[in-house]
């Protein structure tokens, strides 16, 4: 049976409503609220890590080390950077850009670029996003701008969208992708 790890920053009740599997175990461990569910097809371990990239990276490593998860999913609320995405209910992230990662003063690389990647975009697992879109065609593929800053200012949303071609923004994805 596959084990799915899920990182949730805030709204744990939304996950429970969406996935509605049978709760097997609920516990507090290593500073995390951990919920374990099972269906006939998979086991799901949900960690409520709190908001932010460092919290998400830590929660992701916890899932990998302690539960040996096969995949990690990020479930949460995002902000739309375009009018269309402000109205969209569900999406699937195909690429992530860490918009507030900036070493350009030291190494002259572009903002968001990690040297081990060919460009500013951190890839997600293509086979997973393709499979998810086959099962749920309503999922809109997006580029996610991730950073440790809640973006509420409309002008800043426009800047992030224009600078990185991002459709949504949130605070956990870069930490999760870099950890996996």
For every predicted segment, state its role:
Residues 164-170:
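Catalytic beta-strand/loop module used to bind and position nucleotide/cofactor moieties
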Residues 1, 82, 86, 179:
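Phosphate/ribose-phosphate-bearing ligand recognition and processing surfaces
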Residues 170-180:
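Short glycine-rich, acidic/polar surface loops and turns
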Residues 68-73, 166, 180:
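Proline-aspartate-enriched helix->loop->beta-strand connector
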Residues 81-164:
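Mid-sequence, gly/pro-rich, charge-dense loop/helix-turn segments that line enzyme active sites
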Residues 1-61, 66-67:
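N-terminal short beta-loop-beta anion/metal-coordinating cradle
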């Amino acid at each position: 049976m596959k084990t799915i790890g899920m990182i949730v920053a805030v709204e744990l009740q939304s996950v429970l409503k969406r996935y509605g599997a049978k709760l097997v175990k609920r516990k507090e461990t290593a500073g995390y609220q951990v919920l374990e569910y099972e269906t006939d097809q998979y086991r799901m371990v949900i960690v409520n890590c709190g908001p932010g990239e460092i919290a998400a990276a830590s929660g992701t490593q916890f899932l990998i080390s302690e539960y040996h998860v096969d995949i990690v999913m990020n479930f949460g609320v995002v902000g739309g950077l375009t009018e269309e995405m402000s109205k969209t209910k569900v999406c699937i992230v195909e690429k992530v850009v860490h918009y507030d990662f900036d070493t350009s003063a030291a190494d002259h690389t572009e903002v968001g670029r990690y040297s081990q990647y060919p460009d500013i975009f951190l890839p997600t697992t293509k086979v997973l996003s393709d499979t998810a879109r086959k099962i749920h065609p309503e999922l809109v593929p997006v580029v996610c701008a991730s950073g440790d800053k809640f973006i509420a200012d409309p002008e800043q949303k426009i800047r992030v969208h224009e600078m990185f071609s991002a459709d949504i923004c949130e605070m956990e994805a870069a930490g999760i992708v870099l950890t996996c």
